[in-house]
Amino acid sequence: SLAPPSPDSLSSSPQKPSNSLRTSTANSIPVARNYWDGFTSSTMKFSPENARPSLEETRAVRVGDWQIAPLPDDLQDRRSEITGPVDRKMMINALNSGACVFMADLEDSNTPHWHNQIQGQINLRGAYDCSISFTNPEGKHYALKDGRLAVMLIRPRGLHMEEKHLLVEGESSSGSLLDVGLYLFHNAQRALDAGTGPYFYLPKIEGHLEARWFNEVFTWSEQRLGIPHGSIKATVLIETILAAFEMEEIIHELRDHMAGLNAGR
C-alpha cells in the first residue's frame, strides 16, 4: 500500500512526480499517520448496497422546517464559474480569469492516471501558496496575478472510481477518497489561512445516502485535522436521474457542509 505524499515531498515546481511522492515521510508524523490510516480504512468505503430507500421514508425532510449552515463570504457570489483540469497552465489561467469560482477538476477533464492525480495535488498546493508557475517551450511565463483570484472548488473523482495505486487490505481504494484525503491533508488549513476554505464539487451523486457518507467523511476529517466544524463546504452536481428526485434530502444530509446544487454545464 502507499502512503500520501508528505508536505515536504510535495513541490509546486514543474516536475514529474517521483518516488518521493509515493514514499512519504509523513508516516513518521503521528497526526498524518492517524489521519491517513483512518481515512483509507475499509469502513470508510461507500457501499451501494441498499442505497435506494423509499422516498416515503424521507418525506419529513421534504416537508420539514430546517436550513443549511451559513455560507462563507467568498461563496456568496457565484454568478460566473470556470472549470478546467488541474494542469499548471490551465489552473493559472483559470485563477486569473476574473471568474467568481474556478472548479479545479480531478475528474472528467483529467485523465485519472497516477501521474495526473499526484501532479494535480502538487499544483493545488502551489496555488494556495501562490508559488505555482509555468513556462512554455517558447519561453512564455505564466504566474498568478496580484489581487483577487477565483475561489477554488475541487472536484474529486466519483464514488464509482477506484485507485489501484493505493491498496487497502489488498484491494484498490476509492479514487474519490484519495482525491479528497490528499487535498484536505495538505490544503485544508492553508485554504483557511488564505481567507477561503476547503471547498468541493461532488460529482455523480445518486442519492442522499451518498451525501450522508460524504458528510461523515467531512466531519471526520475536520475533527482529525483540527479545523472548525463546517469549514469544509461542498456543492453537489445533480447529473443523475436518481439525485434529481432526492435534492432536498441531499441538501439536508450535507446541511452543515452544503454550498448549493449545480445542474451541470
Task: Report each predicted region and the residues it spans.
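Active-site-surrounding "flap" and adjacent substrate/cofactor-binding loops of secreted or lumenal enzymes
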Residues: 114, 118-131
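TRNA-binding/sensing appendages of the translation machinery
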Residues: 78-81, 96-108
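Conserved alpha/beta-domain cores
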Residues: 2-17, 51, 55-64, 72, ...
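Glycine-rich, proline-tolerant flexible connector loops at the mouths of alpha/beta enzymes
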Residues: 103-119, 202-205
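Low-complexity, highly charged intrinsically disordered N-terminal segments
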Residues: 10-60
